[in-house]
Amino acid sequence: MVSAAWLRYPSLLTLGILVSRVAAQYEGDVLRYVDQLVGTANGGHAFPGASLPYGMAKAVADVDGSENYGGFTTEGSNVTGFSHMHDSGTGGKPSMGNFPLVPQICQDDDINKCKFSKEDRAVHYIADSVKARPGYFAIKLNNGIAAEMTVTEHAALYHFDFPHNNAESNGKLPVILVDLTDIQDSRQNAAISLDEDTLRVKANGTFLPSFGIGTYKSFVCVDFSGAEAKDTGIYISNRAGTQPKAISVGRGFNLFYIKAGTYLQFQASSNGPTRVSARVGLSFINEDQACKNAEKEIPGSNWDFEKVRTDAESAWKEKLGLISLKSGGVSDIFQRTFWSAIYRSMISPQDYTGENPLWQSKEPYFDSFYCLLDTYKHQGWLPDCHMSLCKGFTQSGSNADVVIADAYVKSISDNIDWDLAYEAVVKDAEVEPPDWSVEGRGGLMSWKSVGYIPAQDYDYLGTGITTRSISRTVEYSYNDYCVGVLGKGLGKEHEKYFQRSGNWQNLFKADQTSFIDGKDTGFVGFFQPRYYNGTWGYQDPILCSNIAAFCSLTSNSQETYESGIWENQFFVPHDMSTLINLLGGRSKFVARLDYLHDSNILYIGNEPSFLATFLYHYAGRPALSAKRAHTYIPSRFNDTTTGVPGNDDSGAMGSFTVFAMMGLFPNPGQNVYFIMPPFFEAVSIKHPVTGKTATVRNVNFDSKYENVYIQRATLNGKEYTRNWIGHEFFLNGGTLELTLGKEESSWGTGQNDVPPSLGAGIKRDGLRFT
């Protein structure tokens, strides 16, 4: 899954709202529970290096393995360099990793015998040498070179320790390359220069994003200290020279990738290891801005590594101290799982304030999740996904609409122009952009005329990948619901959008069956693709699921996206009551949902599975949601390097873990949190504006998790039977007390206890097919 996931199912946004607006006390050093290596194997793609909360600078060792999307992995790959900006948990292609520093000792101390290409310079690392703590990363390579790094907002600081003698190379002089490349070798053109008097290196380059269109420009300013320089110069391909001190490269003949950069060779210490330090300033504006960032944030010439490191730790302690726990004696496995997940949810979005080259603004600017209304105001459309200043590919719906509705219903109103927000989401719903692969929606002619996105849709208004007709239909339905929510709240047009939000029903084929390995599953009625003329197409309900062929945006693209019809059929977040009735009532709905989970059809490593874990609440069976949460945590979400079951997607998997373990899981775009027992005895959140504290407390809690079913609940001492609660609980504070037992009870099962739905029987007047 790629970084757009936060927009498709944006529980991460809600976590950001809570965490950024609360300030609870913490006991001791919460950083001891953060393991940055969680999710660095098995496709988690988590970034494990040094970063501030939402920081632009992200320093780590880059490796050459196929899973190096976050720079470093724990799967035994080789280190190719150390770079300063990364994303975390994303898919598509590896992102950033621009201008890596490459420490080495060259054969016979001959600069022309240095290893310039990634393939030649790759060196394995000593596994137990890896040390990661918030704001810090350290590693030792098999060639004896050790590296440690820390960061500020826009700069990285490295220590490289070179061994006194390197028998393998028969040399002793430290060399550091500054390479004109990135992780995915996407550089289009670049330039680099070196001042031989100050040893300052400036570089710039144009690169491709990981999952989108266009290019972005990146700039660095590198200073060195700690050892006297012997020689400096440039290299191109596999040759180097002391003159000139600057070089520019393009993509090369026939798009051949030209290897180039600068080198610095230092004198070695006469009596022990040689330390060379490097300060790297970063910018998206220009090289001078990169230098200013470095000089401002890590001033002077004798850089205080420990101060930078402790300042970074303090920033993380402040952020991670926002939520307080009473553990109740649970294993440290669960503490590490919880705090590591919160940590990963705060790596992105990245604060690029002051580093926006797209337009002049003094407003806060975040990338990798973009500032939505600012984007609309300056570029004309809400984005579905954004990274490295570039427009990212839309995966199904126009899910910025969901994010905006989510903020509105949760009363996040400070300095938000809601009229502009409504204008933006209505444009998504009514106007098709020329390129709807990166913004807005495609197929709007059909959406308005027949009430669904047809298979093989004839769409001449814009261009995009005309697949995913089922996924787009169910997501457009929810997008329109969210437009209606905002419209109703603002006293503007909303009924039309509420009506359109029922369009998902137009793809429900009541007699469709499903067979797995030739055996009838026993369930009848599934979504199916439909042509514009109303006739039905066919897609096997298990295709694109966890037990069949994977379907991505560009490879094996089908009528559903990254999940099959079996999973898509449950995505009606706004009208579960209608869906439950359509599937035969509560009992049959629960049986079908059980089958989805128990037959391994659902892939918990992608965001479409998030909501499906907790839909039992709508059928009056909240105990089964709690059971499912404990099924997936810690079996799939845990504190190991493989403890993220799929791409972490900029902390989306982390946010799933945090909300599930807190016992309050949001339905994004609605003022609804599903109530379950927290994985700890108590969880508290304090709101700094209201000064109120919201606490969820378990009674009869046991650390072995035998009592995971709610028997009764009270809110501020009064009986509480609803199995959900609104965001006002966090705004106003209070105590939600849950009495637990070993068996499912009648709590939260009544018709009036389930979360709200838009309602059955939505009139779809004007739609051709019903």
Swiss-Prot record:
Cell division listed as a keyword: no
Disulphide connectivity of cysteines: none
Record keywords: Glycoprotein, Glycosidase, Hydrolase, Secreted, Signal
Glycosylated residues (UniProt): 78, 204, 533, 638
GO cellular component, one term: extracellular region
EC number(s) reported in the record: 3.2.1.-
Keyword RNA-binding: no
Residues of the signal peptide: 1-24
Superkingdom: Eukaryota
Region annotated Disordered, chain positions: 746-770
SUPFAM superfamilies reported for this sequence: Six-hairpin glycosidases
GO biological process: carbohydrate metabolic process; glycoprotein catabolic process
MF terms (GO), sorted A to Z: carbohydrate binding; hydrolase activity, acting on glycosyl bonds; peptide-N4-(N-acetyl-beta-glucosaminyl)asparagine amidase activity
Subcellular location: Secreted
InterPro entries recorded: 6-hairpin_glycosidase_sf, GH-type_carb-bd, GH92_N, Glyco_hydro_92, PNGase
Family to which this protein belongs: Belongs to the glycosyl hydrolase 92 family.
Protein name (database record): Uncharacterized secreted glycosidase ARB_07629
Organism: Arthroderma benhamiae (strain ATCC MYA-4681 / CBS 112371)
